[in-house]
Amino acid sequence: MALCRRISYLYALALLTVYALFLPLGGYERMMEGKYRAFLLLSLGYVLAMTALGAWKAVRWRAPMCLAALAYLALTALSAALSPYGTAVLLGGTRRDGLLTAALYAAVFLLLARHLRPDRRLLYAAAVSAALCDLLVLVQLMGRNPLWLYPTGLNYFDGDVAYSGFYAGAAGNIDFTAFLLALCAAAMAAALVRGWSKWLLAPFALTMWTLWQLRVAAALLGLAVTAVLGLPLLFPRRRRAMWALTLLLTAAAFALIWFFPGDGGTLSELHRLLHGDVDLTFGSSRLLIWRSLLPLITERPLLGGGCGTLYLRDVPPFYWQRGGEITYFAVTSAHNEYLGVLVDQGALALLAFLALLALALWRAYRHAESDRCAVAGAALLCYAVTAFFSVACCITGVYLWLLLAMLAPKEE
């Protein structure tokens, strides 16, 4: 048992450091495939090592969170078995979000939920990783090409001109980089509120500055919502007062959005939406993408099309309008992790997934007196909000299952 705990701890530490900072050869052009191979190496190695040690015998199969994870895996496997796209479900598309990835997520969660004993050192390691990523991003935002991650002669500001999208940091696409930095920022903020080491102020401030410079609306929104909804989590002894303050701040936020039209950007889009002015190009055309997926849901509502098969289905391209030019892009992701599960794995798998997420958040709030639950709960809450606008892949997804495992009941 002690060896299983040690290996689980080392695996979690590797995810927060080695994997988070891993940069594949070939730079951003090879980022997704390189990260996926690193994920397979770490996660398959961990699962096989734990299997050899007989670690599965100790798994609490009847625990509510484990049952939800097993239901999610079983329904995902059933969706894959009945998919009309054959073996394409095993690996999925270019983001490698197929059955193999989903199975590894569930296996890693079940093992970590029983054997991982998280402590402060894991957050400190994540803070160091975030700070190093911050420094890389800030240098890239100066127009430099450190570590030759961009093609020769190009830099960050060539995004959406010489190549599609914007890339920075150790996760590739700035949406992924900002997503991971937001999770670290939420966890560090919770730890600072709980009186952990003050040296966390340095990486926290650096991470917040980097997020502001990247201007990824989904990550900033995730942090803002976490700051409000996380109050009862961070101050459990004043729970009633914190819930009242949360409701007050939520009402104030809605009032601000309702009355303040903004001068462009996300705030203006939210203002127009509240007033019934719906433009499908809002959120980088996310509304257009989500609407285009509705026919796919009605085709296979219960079990979906199979893991990672959205790119094989008949979805109209979405577009961005810049000045007088319109650029079209193929839809290969739902750009919403929950909608992605609904389309690919069906409503039943989505219900199991939401049940697992709800159980974890319920534990975080119920046991908020525990620093472990408060810190992991804040990061999970940030993930749950940001995922509403995110693309599912192993670069970010593995950290969801790590956080879920941290919030699972632990036996001393």
Cite the ranges covered by each PLM segment.
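Alpha-helical transmembrane segments and their immediate interhelical/interface regions
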Residues: 24-40, 86-113, 258-282
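Alpha-helical transmembrane segments of multi-pass inner-membrane proteins
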Residues: 10-15, 19-20, 41-50, 73, ...
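A conserved mid-to-late transmembrane alpha helix and its immediate loop/hinge
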Residues: 173, 294, 300, 325-362
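N-terminal membrane topogenic signal
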Residues: 1-12
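Interfacial juxtamembrane loops and adjacent helix segments
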Residues: 145-168, 268-283, 308-343
